[in-house]
């Protein structure tokens, strides 16, 4: 082989080796880039379902040292998994209740444009809590606020704000309603909104901002619902609705709703004689409600809802320290767990309680005759023992010299347990305060705590003489 051939051969071999090295480096670069972008890649949805967004773990015996100078690395943010709520965690063990929120709506109305409201309640989604109320279609310092003591007018709408934000002029009007309930199923809000003629009202079911279903009055006598949050478990929401006499036999039905569509209706069964304005809470796998008997009992009805087979049972809270107003004094009040006590049963007020093993936590007005003051306490054996009256852990929420009103429960899911909270409606204006022509409210909110707590009173606090007439 002559020198020129040697040179050509060596050059060809070198070029081949260089080409192979280049291809290997290109393959390594492509592999590295692909692995980098796939490390935080979201899995492709299967069957239109949202899949978990997890990093891919790559195991290899290669140590890579990367030197970065003035380099910004942006990590892809994957969307959170949206799931239905199931409320399967246990109930938090508490020692009492601690202050959480107060909106001061009436005090602020003395110098600002705040809605006239009543029938407030609170409900939460995964991230925030919201306050709701039924507006009267007017602000307080407005001639339209005259005679707003009336419950049912076509101008009433359901208002919704973040908890602690008073209902100002920019407040969202969710729907037309003079009776309502709202709850979040984990994916979207459901609002049950009732409006129309007393003898032929309509309940609209609004889910994720859209009207999905409706139902008309079935007894032609003021179709009405809870005035507090409904409850959703695994995509099915349930709400208690009543149509019929407020002081006699009425027709109560429990509706089951999936993404705004009514999927089943169950009649009330069990021993409860009259049920309205229920305060419901998740008690996995079912739902439990504490209601108002406006006919026969000052002891509160209990409605147990089976979310799997749609069956219903009902009874009464066993505690002999009864929760409704008006009621007998504590020495003479009674409850046998099964039947209304026939003690000042006519009339009443929305309220709440919840079971804690054999015991019961409850709230009620301090006055046995009027919607004045508010207290909470635990009754030992109050859930299981007829006429139990051993009271512990009493707290004053509103002192007896100040007005209260409706109250209700809402549930908040924590990391390890489900906490129970409650709100108290602080009514002001007519009938008791005849200097003004309007009737409205503010709210105060407390939540269960496992810690210690002090004492106090949290009334509405507005000086009626400072208020617009």
UniProtKB/Swiss-Prot annotation:
Region annotated Hypervariable stalk region, chain positions: 36-90
Tell me, what controls this protein's activity?
Inhibited by the neuraminidase inhibitors zanamivir (Relenza) and oseltamivir (Tamiflu). These drugs interfere with the release of progeny virus from infected cells and are effective against all influenza strains. Resistance to neuraminidase inhibitors is quite rare.
Give the EC class as a word.
hydrolase
Which residues does UniProt mark as catalytic?
151, 406
**TM annotation in the entry:** 7-29
Keywords assigned: Calcium, Disulfide bond, Glycoprotein, Glycosidase, Host cell membrane, Host membrane, Hydrolase, Membrane, Metal-binding, Signal-anchor, Transmembrane, Transmembrane helix, Virion
In this chain, the stretch annotated as Disordered covers 324-350
**Might you name a Gene Ontology BP term for this protein?**
viral budding from plasma membrane
Q: Segment Involved in apical transport and lipid raft association: which positions?
A: 11-33
Identify the cofactor(s): Ca(2+)
Which Gene3D superfamilies has this protein been placed in? Answer: 2.120.10.10
The entry marks the following residues as binding substrate, namely 118, 152, 276-277, 292, 371
Q: Where is the composition biased (Low complexity)?
A: 333-342
- One GO molecular-function annotation for this sequence? metal ion binding
Q: Where in the cell is it found?
A: Virion membrane; Host apical cell membrane
Spell out the note in the miscellaneous section: The influenza A genome consist of 8 RNA segments. Genetic variation of hemagglutinin and/or neuraminidase genes results in the emergence of new influenza strains. The mechanism of variation can be the result of point mutations or the result of genetic reassortment between segments of two different strains.
Record-given protein name: Neuraminidase
Organism listed in the record = Influenza A virus (strain A/Northern Territory/60/1968 H3N2)
């Amino acid at each position: 082989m002559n020198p020129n051939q040697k040179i050509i051969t060596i050059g060809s071999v070198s070029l081949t080796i260089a080409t192979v090295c280049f291809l290997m480096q290109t393959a390594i670069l492509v592999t590295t880039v692909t692995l980098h972008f796939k490390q935080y890649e979201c899995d492709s949805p299967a069957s239109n379902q949202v899949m978990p967004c997890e990093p891919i773990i790559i195991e290899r015996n290669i140590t890579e040292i990367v030197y970065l100078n003035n380099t910004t690395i942006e990590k892809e943010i994957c969307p959170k998994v949206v799931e239905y709520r199931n409320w399967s965690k246990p109930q938090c063990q508490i020692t009492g209740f601690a202050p959480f929120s107060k909106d001061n709506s009436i005090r602020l109305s003395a110098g600002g444009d705040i809605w006239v409201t009543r029938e407030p309640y609170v409900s939460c989604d995964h991230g925030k809590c919201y306050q709701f109320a039924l507006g009267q279609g007017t602000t307080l310092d407005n001639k339209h606020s005259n005679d707003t003591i009336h419950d049912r007018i076509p101008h009433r709408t359901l208002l919704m704000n973040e908890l602690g934000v008073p209902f100002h002029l920019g407040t969202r009007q969710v729907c037309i309603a003079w009776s309502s309930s709202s709850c979040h199923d984990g994916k979207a809000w459901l609002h049950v909104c009732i409006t129309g003629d007393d003898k032929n009202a309509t309940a609209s079911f609004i889910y994720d901002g859209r009207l999905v279903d409706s139902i008309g009055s079935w007894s032609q006598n003021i179709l009405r619902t809870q005035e507090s949050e409904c409850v959703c478990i695994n995509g099915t929401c349930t709400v208690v609705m009543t149509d019929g006499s407020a002081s006699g036999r009425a027709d109560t039905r429990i509706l089951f709703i999936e993404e705004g569509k009514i999927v089943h209706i169950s009649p009330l069964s069990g021993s409860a004689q009259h049920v309205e304005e229920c305060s419901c809470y998740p008690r996995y796998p079912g739902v439990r409600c504490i209601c108002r008997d406006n006919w026969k009992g000052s002891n509160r009805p209990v409605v147990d809802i089976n979310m799997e087979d749609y069956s219903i049972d009902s009874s009464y809270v066993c505690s002999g320290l009864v929760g409704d107003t008006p009621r007998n004094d504590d020495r003479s009040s009674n409850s046998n767990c099964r039947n209304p006590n026939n003690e000042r049963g006519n009339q009443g007020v929305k309220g709440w309680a919840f079971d804690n093993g054999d015991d019961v936590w409850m709230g009620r007005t301090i006055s046995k005759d009027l919607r004045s003051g508010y207290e909470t306490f635990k009754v030992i054996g109050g859930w299981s023992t007829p006429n139990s009256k051993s009271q512990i852990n009493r707290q004053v929420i509103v002192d007896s010299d100040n007005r209260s009103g409706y109250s209700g429960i809402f549930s908040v899911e924590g990391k390890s347990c489900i906490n129970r909270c409650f709100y108290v409606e602080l009514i002001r204006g007519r009938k008791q305060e005849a200097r003004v022509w309007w009737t409205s409210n503010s709210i105060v909110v407390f939540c269960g705590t496992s810690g210690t707590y002090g004492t106090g009173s949290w009334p509405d606090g507005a000086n009626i003489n400072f208020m617009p007439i």
